[in-house]
Amino acid sequence: MEDFVRQCFNPMIVELAEKAMKEYGEDPKIETNKFAAICTHLEVCFMYSDFHFVDERGESIIVESGDPNALLKHRFEIIEGRDRTMAWTVVNSICNTTGIEKPKFLPDLYDYKENRFIEIGVTRREVHIYYLEKANKIKSEKTHIHIFSFTGEEMATKADYTLDEESRARIKTRLFTIRQEMASRGLWDSFVNPREAKRQLKKDLKLQEPCAGSPTKVSHRTSPALKTLEPMWMDSNRTAALRASFLKCPRK
């Protein structure tokens, strides 16, 4: 699973996920399913935000290529992926500027057009069950909830899906592709079932122990199918700024 995650997701997403797990004392090499789940959630948050802007009148527009007009600003503020201190600083700044109620839990995004925080969910289960769990945890009508599943289903507060149909379809397609590729590698069942994941981990650890006298052959090639998974959605104009903002610690 770890190899799949590192090949499947944008390096910046992987780096952010590793940083988030280490902040809570978790090891991406051991808790590989959680590693995959965090990367998936991060990517959905970025895809939700990318290419969406607001103009000087506060109207929402989509710009998919080229340099956006200087008067445009990103419609969504990405909060997910930042360290907790910085994330709360961003939330507090938004609340002080807009007068919006401060959320009890850190949200994933802030929508400048609708003046609301958004909680994004990505589930391997039924969307309505996960939606209710999120709603019961947040207990705030001010935070908008939007849930996506790997089967193409979605659910949002008051059936308000925020984004246009094409943008949401892009997210659903990506999730469905991840599921298919996991399944083709025998990873999907363990991703859905934690008990199966533990058994798979023990099996993997045993397989990593080389037999005495046996030659070891390692392939570093990427399959043609996996190449289709490489995310093309990243807004190149924004990537550098995000990296500087989210990843302040230089690589060693």
Swiss-Prot record:
The record marks 195, 198-199 as: Important for efficient shutoff activity and nuclear localization. This is Protein PA-X. Plays a major role in the shutoff of the host protein expression by cleaving mRNAs probably via an endonuclease activity. This host shutoff allows the virus to escape from the host antiviral response. Hijacks host RNA splicing machinery to selectively target host RNAs containing introns for destruction. This may explain the preferential degradation of RNAs that have undergone co- or post-transcriptional processing. The active site is at 80, 108. Belongs to the influenza viruses PA-X family. The gene is PA. The record marks 202-203, 206 as: Important for efficient shutoff activity. It holds the Pfam family Flu_PA. Its main location: host cell. The probable endonuclease active site in the N-terminus and the basic amino acid cluster in the C-terminus are important for the shutoff activity. The C-terminus acts as a nuclear localization signal. The C-terminus is recruited to host protein complexes involved in nuclear Pol II RNA processing. One of its GO terms (molecular function) is RNA binding. It is found in: Host cytoplasm; Host nucleus. Transmembrane segments: none annotated. GO terms for biological process: viral RNA genome replication; viral translational frameshifting. Keywords: Decay of host mRNAs by virus, Eukaryotic host gene expression shutoff by virus, Host cytoplasm, Host gene expression shutoff by virus, Host mRNA suppression by virus, Host nucleus, Host-virus interaction. It comes from Influenza A virus (strain A/Seal/Massachusetts/1/1980 H7N7). It comes from the Viruses.
